[in-house]
Structure formats: C-alpha cells, structure tokens
C-alpha cells in the first residue's frame, strides 16, 4: 500500500461502512458524489463492495485515507476503473474539516505515481462535477488536462487525464 509524506492508505473493509456513511453524509461532502441518493447507507454498502472487489480484480482500489500523525481517517482515495469505460480513475474525497490543507493534491499525486510506477498504467483519468472547482484545480495542479464534459452516472461531469509520458515530462523521472 502507498503512503505519502502526511498520509497513509489502507484497504477498505466491510467494517468501514459506518465510518463511510458518517464521512459522506454531510451535504458539503456528498453534493459532488451524487448527493444523498448515491450516498445513503444502502447505496454505500453496494459501493463499498465494489471498492473491495477492485483490490482482487485489479490490485488497487479506493482506500481509506488517514493522517500519519494521528491515525485519524480523513477520507477515501485511490485508483479504480470507471464502470462505464473501464478507464482507470484517480479519485479522492475528504471530510470537510480537512479541505484546503493540501491533502487532495498530496493523495492524488501519490496515486498517480503509484499508478504509473507500480501498476504499469499508461493513462489515468479523473472526473468531477464542473462546479467542484477545488477538485478540478487539483487535477490541473497534478498536470492533468481537460478532455471533455460528458455524462458520468447520468450527470454532466468534466473529464481530465494524464499520460505516463506527460506525467514524467512535468514531474521528472524521479517521480516514477
């Protein structure tokens, strides 16, 4: 499992469901994750099973993310396939009190490095609501470029991507 300067990551387990429900229930957090319709306990139980199944199928998946300094879980992030296309997506979401502290960029970079170095991926995508400027600014800061606006789970979203070659060009060979 990867780690960054301030963050650790671990596989999600079925026992994480109550924490996941609590973390994603506030409106500021779930509004960019499909709202309460997609973040209710029943939907999250199904989603958690998908996250867990990705580990065995692909060797990576969405993970619990926590602070090394305290052990506190602060969100989820990871690499996973987009259900519609199979493209590998880097995703991240944080509890609101951990926003604007650089954790989004730190975890996204950690997963991009891992995807290109350890998983042999040639391209990674990211998806966000157009209104979620904080998320797509992280994508741009990581070197990802806008590709299109298209439907994702029936909702208009912006799609960004970065290739291994572009990542290495921006961040150097030491990142891989």
Locate the predicted segments by residue.
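Acyl-donor (CoA/ACP) binding surface of acyl/acetyltransferases
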Residues: 1-32, 49-50, 62-176
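Active-site rim helix/loop that mediates acceptor-substrate recognition in acyltransferases
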Residues: 39-58
């Amino acid at each position: 499992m990867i780690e960054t300067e301030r963050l650790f990551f671990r596989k999600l387990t079925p026992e994480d469901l109550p924490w996941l429900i609590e973390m994603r229930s506030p409106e500021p957090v779930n509004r960019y994750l499909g709202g309460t319709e997609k973040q209710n306990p029943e939907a999250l139980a199904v989603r958690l099973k998908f996250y867990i199944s990705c580990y065995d199928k692909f060797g990576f998946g969405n993970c619990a993310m926590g602070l090394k300094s305290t052990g506190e879980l602060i969100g989820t992030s990871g690499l996973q396939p987009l259900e519609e296309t199979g493209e590998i997506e880097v995703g991240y979401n944080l509890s609101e009190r951990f926003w604007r502290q650089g954790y989004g960029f730190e975890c996204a970079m950690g997963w991009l490095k891992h995807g290109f170095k350890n998983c042999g991926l040639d391209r990674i995508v990211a998806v966000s609501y157009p209104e979620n400027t904080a998320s797509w600014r992280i994508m741009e800061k990581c070197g990802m470029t806008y590709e299109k606006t298209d439907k994702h789970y029936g909702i208009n979203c912006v799609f960004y991507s970065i290739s291994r070659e572009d990542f290495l060009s921006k961040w150097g060979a030491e990142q891989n």
